Each structure stands twice: as structure tokens, then as C-alpha cells.
């Protein structure tokens, strides 16, 4: 028997070498395949190979593990679930189940995990709106610390964070630590029919009636004039109705998002400051040294201020006067495709992701030409009469990678590897082409983009390239418990929509409810301390304080769309 031992050893060695060579060959083939799948990329094919090889090597200690992650139901995340999770598993041997669920379900499951300490998912693509909650509840891994310490060896040298990211500040705490990293982002913008706005017939009609040029509205006063023009004066085009406004007003949680997603910042509520107003943010919450002290005017907040009441009143007036009659019965999930049907001239509320609906790019649709190029454009939303330079303007949704603190050890590491893969330079451009929600500068400044290749996107890429994007930010850090406070919004705002309360009554009741709820919170860090009411007159004179009521509607200002793009190219604002 002993004579055969060298032969057995030799055959075992040959067999082992064969397995290793086969495995190496399989990995090389997989990398070759995915390089083709992920092209075009911001990286050269050589650099794509280096990045993918790094993931394969870094994941070796975790091979055979299984992790679960989740994200909300938009096209970008569906691509991650169907394509990126598969690629990551092939390349690393880590099995990933990337669940696609409703936006509310993402928050609900994350809340449950935080409350019960039971792992439901190892990582979430959770809106950056939650960062104030994560900060105070210490519920998310501080990724900037993790990358420097325990996660240092599995943090990709190719990540290029924060330098290459469009808005990394969407995941920062007050001191600049990273709680969440943007996976994708999309703005809420103004949408309009460029073909109609540049038609000499309508330009002449508008100028004669209103005394200024028809163009992209910069202010709410101009938006209102333009809404009236299409709905009340043009009325029909080619025998079909044309409406000067579209929005949604159905009672439900979506009506809360419509406002908590920075609508009141457009009205001009809050303090100056970027990415969010300090000491008062776009939720009307005042903080002192990071501690929330009130949302009511009497406590230095602004949620029941003249600017907030104006914001709600304007929303209701536009909806009732200038939108199609069915708009009051719409919810968020229904409104996106409607402008693509050809009967809407403009809308002040248009999510960038809506442009992925077929009618916005299908040849010869009501809003495209024979090549499928858009007759529509996107531009920044106009702002209201209380807005001042130095304030944020609108909203960007930033679905961001978030690792709960109860995910530890190897599971945390494996989740971090997949999160990095989903935002890697190798995949980011292809992911944008699918879902139109970028996260990197290298995506929107890629050499493939020129005047012709940007046309199908209707101004979206130009927006992300401009400095204007820095004024459109997500919910800030002042909100101490986002799920708890946000669910109040729709309940009170819907009372104004149905006529049960006036806008002033609804905003006063909402502000008082927010103060009441915040006063009950006992959080581990920077917990609210709701102060004694000092009265509105006191706060009028304080930094970042209240603005007195403005009686007039403000000045009507428009800008020529092409002139705006020219300004952007020169790093100017509109």
C-alpha cells in the first residue's frame, strides 16, 4: 500500500491543480461576460476587469454566504435585483437576494428591524430622508468610520467616494460623517411641452395677454399665469383639451410625501443653508445645536408660518383651477404617465423617473417625434414669493445604502461588498441608461454625452451637470423620527384638500401635532427638547426666523429654456 501513496498524492495534486485552473478559468469567463454586459461603462475594459477581479478576491472569505437586501420599486432597483445580484453572485460566490418592495414597506421593515433587533435584511436602499432618524437612534453603521477601520480591507480602492459622487452630502450627519451612501438619485422637476412653448402662435398670444415672454417659469406667479393661459385661454389643441397644470390630490400617504419632499422650501419656508436650512429646515423644524426644539411658530419653527400656509394654498388653487377634474382623485403612482398622453402643457411636479414610461420615448407618441425624441423638456421647479437666494429650492430623492447596526461581523462585510458593487464605476453608467437615476459625476460627464446623445433625456443630464442640482436636496437632519412624523402630514393636509379645514387651520394642527410627538421622543442622541412657546414676535427677530406675511403674489419671471442651458454650461444658475 505504501508504494501507491506517492501516486495517490500525485493524482490528488494534479486533480487539485485542475480544479483551481478550472475555477480560475470560470471566473475569467464570468468577468469577460459581465464586462460586455456592463458596457458602456465609465471605466475602460481593462479597468473594469481590475475592479471585478478585486471584488472576486475581496469576497473569498465570504464565499458561500447568503445575504438579503431590499429596495423600493423603481426600474433602477429592479435592474439591481435581476442583473447586478446575479453578477455579484457569479463573481464572488456570495448569494444575494435583493428584494424589490414598496417604498413604505422598506421603511416599515427597517423600523421593525430597529425595534426588534431581529435581522430582516442585511442592508437597505433607504432614502437619505432617514438620516436624522439614524443619527439620533444610532440605527445605521457609520460608514465613514467603518471604511477606515474594520471594513478597511474590504473597501474598494476603486470606490472613489466621496469625490465621484454627485451629492454625497445627502448621507452626512451634522459633522460630515457618512451614515448612508447614495445608490441612485432623482429630482422632482418642472416638465413642459417645449414644442408648444416655442410655437410662435402661442408665444404671441401669451405676450399680448400677460406682457412678458412665455418660457420656463422661475417663480410661482409666472407658473400660475402659464397655467391659466393653457387651461382658460388656449383650452384645446387639434380638438383635444390642453391643461396648464397637473398634480395629484387623493387622500393617502402619497399626499404627505408630496409636501414633506421639500414643497415648502419652494414656497420659501425655512432658513438659508445648504444642503438644508439651519436652524430651520424645509419641514419647519428648528434645531439648536442639533436638538429639535419645535415646529410651531411659537417655538421658533415654521410649519404653521405664512410661507407654509401659502405653499398649501397655492397647491390647492392650482389643482382646483387649472388641472383636469380627475387630478384630485389621483395618487402618486398614477400621475407619472399622464403628461405623456399629450394633454398636459406643464406640471410643477414631475419625478425624473417618470421619463422612463414608454410614451416619453416611443416614436410618434403624443409627446415625441418620429424618432422618439422628446417634444418635452425638464427644468428646475419654480419657487414662491418667500424664497430667497441662499435657500434650497426643491427635492432630490436619494435611495442610499444603509447597513443597520445589528448586522455585524461577516454579514456586515458581505452586505458592504454588495452595496459597493451596486454603486461601482463598472456598473453605474449602464444602471443609469436603464433607470435614469445617476449617482456619480463620471456618469453624467461621460464623453458619450453630447448635444445629440443627451436629447432623449429632455434636460435631465444637463440638470445633473449643473450647479442647480446642489439646490435640490433631500430631507435634512433636523427630522428626529422620519416615519413617525411623516405619517402625520397626509392626514392633516388631506383635511385642507377636502375643505374640512382651511390651509391655515391644517398647518397649525400639523405643527402642533409634530411638537406633541417630538416632545415624547426619548432618543439616544440629540433627542428633541421642545421648548416653551415664546410667541411669534420673539422669533421674528431671531436668526433664520420667521418671515412676515407677504400680501402680493410676487413677481412673474420666466426664462428661455435654451438660455438657461447656456447659463448652466457656464456654471451659472438660471
Per-region residue spans from a language model:
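Extracytoplasmic "Venus flytrap"/periplasmic binding protein-like
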Residues: 29, 86-165, 200-201, 205-207, ...
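Short, polar/charged alpha-helical segment
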Residues: 51-58, 75-95, 191, 195, ...
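Periplasmic solute-binding protein
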Residues: 128-148, 164-212, 224, 247-296, ...
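Hinge/lid segment of periplasmic solute-binding proteins
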Residues: 30-61, 128-189, 373-381, 553-574
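Extracytoplasmic/periplasmic substrate-recognition and gating elements
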Residues: 176, 320-326, 344-346, 362-444, ...
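Glycine-centered hinge/linker elements that transmit conformational signals in sensory
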Residues: 222-228, 266-329, 372, 377-382
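Long, aromatic- and glycine/proline-rich binding clefts that accommodate carbohydrate-like moieties
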Residues: 49-54, 66, 373-383, 395, ...
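Extracytoplasmic "Venus flytrap"
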Residues: 44, 49-52, 64-83, 186
Amino acid at each position: 500500500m505504501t508504494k501507491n501513496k506517492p501516486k495517490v498524492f500525485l493524482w490528488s495534486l494534479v486533480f487539485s491543480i485542475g480544479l483551481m485552473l478550472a475555477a480560475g478559468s470560470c471566473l475569467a469567463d464570468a468577468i469577460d461576460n459581465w464586462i460586455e454586459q456592463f458596457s458602456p461603462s465609465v471605466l475602460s475594459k481593462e479597468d473594469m476587469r481590475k475592479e471585478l477581479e478585486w471584488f472576486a478576491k475581496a469576497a473569498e472569505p465570504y464565499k458561500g454566504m447568503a445575504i438579503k437586501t431590499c429596495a423600493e420599486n423603481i426600474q433602477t432597483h429592479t435592474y439591481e435585483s435581476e442583473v447586478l445580484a446575479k453578477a455579484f453572485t457569479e463573481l464572488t460566490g456570495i448569494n444575494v437576494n435583493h428584494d424589490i418592495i414598496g417604498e413604505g414597506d422598506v421603511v416599515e421593515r427597517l423600523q421593525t428591524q430597529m425595534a426588534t433587533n431581529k435581522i430582516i435584511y442585511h442592508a437597505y436602499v433607504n432614502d437619505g430622508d432617514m438620516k436624522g432618524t439614524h443619527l439620533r437612534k444610532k440605527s445605521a453603521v457609520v460608514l465613514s468610520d467603518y471604511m477606515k477601520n474594520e471594513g478597511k480591507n474590504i473597501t474598494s480602492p476603486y470606490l472613489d467616494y466621496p469625490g465621484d459622487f454627485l451629492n454625497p452630502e445627502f448621507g452626512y450627519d451634522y459633522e460630515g460623517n457618512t451614515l448612508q451612501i447614495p445608490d441612485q438619485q432623482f429630482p422632482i422637476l418642472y416638465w413642459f411641452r417645449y414644442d408648444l412653448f416655442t410655437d410662435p402662435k402661442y408665444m404671441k398670444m401669451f405676450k399680448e395677454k400677460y406682457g412678458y415672454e412665455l418660457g420656463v417659469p422661475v417663480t410661482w406667479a409666472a407658473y400660475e399665469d402659464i397655467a391659466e393661459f393653457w387651461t382658460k385661454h388656449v383650452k384645446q389643441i387639434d380638438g383635444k383639451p390642453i391643461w396648464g397644470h397637473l398634480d395629484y390630490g387623493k387622500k393617502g400617504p402619497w399626499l404627505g410625501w408630496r409636501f414633506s419632499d421639500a414643497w415648502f422650501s419652494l414656497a420659501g419656508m425655512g432658513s438659508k443653508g445648504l444642503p438644508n436650512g439651519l436652524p430651520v429646515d424645509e419641514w419647519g423644524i428648528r434645531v439648536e445645536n442639533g436638538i429639535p426644539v419645535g415646529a410651531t411658530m411659537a417655538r421658533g419653527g415654521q410649519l404653521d408660518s405664512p410661507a407654509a400656509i401659502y405653499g398649501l394654498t397655492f397647491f390647492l388653487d392650482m389643482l382646483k383651477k387649472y388641472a383636469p377634474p380627475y387630478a384630485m382623485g389621483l395618487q402618486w403612482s398614477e400621475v407619472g404617465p399622464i403628461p405623456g398622453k399629450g394633454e398636459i402643457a406643464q406640471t410643477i411636479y414631475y419625478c425624473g423617473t417618470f421619463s422612463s414610461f414608454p410614451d416619453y420615448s416611443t416614436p410618434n407618441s403624443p409627446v415625441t417625434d418620429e424618432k422618439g425624441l422628446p417634444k418635452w423638456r425638464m427644468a428646475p421647479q419654480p419657487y414662491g414669493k418667500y424664497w430667497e437666494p441662499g435657500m434650497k429650492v426643491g427635492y432630490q430623492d436619494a435611495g442610499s445604502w444603509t447597513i443597520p447596526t445589528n448586522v455585524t461581523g461577516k454579514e456586515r462585510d458581505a452586505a458592504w461588498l454588495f452595496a459597493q458593487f451596486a454603486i461601482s464605476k463598472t456598473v453605474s453608467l449602464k444602471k443609469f441608461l436603464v433607470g435614469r437615476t445617476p449617482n456619480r459625476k463620471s456618469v453624467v460627464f461621460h464623453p458619450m454625452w453630447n448635444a445629440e446623445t443627451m436629447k432623449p433625456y429632455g434636460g435631465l443630464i444637463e440638470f445633473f451637470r449643473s450647479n442647480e442640482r446642489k439646490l435640490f436636496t433631500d430631507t435634512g437632519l433636523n427630522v428626529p423620527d422620519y416615519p413617525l412624523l411623516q405619517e402625520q402630514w397626509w392626514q392633516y393636509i388631506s383635511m385642507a384638500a377636502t375643505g374640512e379645514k382651511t390651509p391655515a387651520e391644517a398647518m397649525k394642527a400639523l405643527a402642533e401635532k409634530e411638537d406633541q410627538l417630538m416632545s415624547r421622543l426619548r432618543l439616544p442622541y440629540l433627542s428633541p427638547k421642545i421648548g416653551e412657546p415664546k410667541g411669534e414676535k420673539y422669533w421674528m427677530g431671531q436668526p433664520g426666523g420667521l418671515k412676515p406675511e407677504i400680501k402680493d403674489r410676487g413677481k412673474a419671471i420666466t426664462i428661455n429654456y435654451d438660455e438657461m442651458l447656456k447659463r448652466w454650461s457656464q456654471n451659472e444658475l438660471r
